[in-house]
């Protein structure tokens, strides 16, 4: 009887360790021309005295011409942004803060990758790409978003690169 309990315990421990190992991801974060200031999954709200301009998404092809690329800083990103797809921007401390929201995604693991930010005549264009999960992901509804800042005040246009 004691031998059966030990075998059952070992079988349960092995089964649990195999299940938990499948949940661990060894994916490394790629860091380009930007600094990650805060990597927590928060969605901070905009105060009432800041102006927000809602704009709809536009989609472009990969063959865009890049003239003047700006540096940027990622302030926050995560899986629980706003429910509606689109972007908005506002100004704070001589910086333009840009928030890009994806629509409802059926699983975890979707990411927004910033390709580049170009400047033309006091207007910037943010080119981004939606990266789907590479492996199996948890079946949970998410609303991916990214919040970034650029030095200076600009009108903003965001375009998804496919």
UniProtKB/Swiss-Prot annotation:
Transmembrane segments: 5-25
Domain of life per record: Archaea
Pfam families: PrcB_C (PF14343)
Entry keyword Oxidoreductase: no
Main subcellular localisation: membrane
UniProt keywords, alphabetically: Membrane, Transmembrane, Transmembrane helix
Claim: Transmembrane helix is one of the keywords in the record: yes
Name this polypeptide is given: Uncharacterized protein MJ1373
Species, as recorded: Methanocaldococcus jannaschii (strain ATCC 43067 / DSM 2661 / JAL-1 / JCM 10045 / NBRC 100440) (Methanococcus jannaschii)
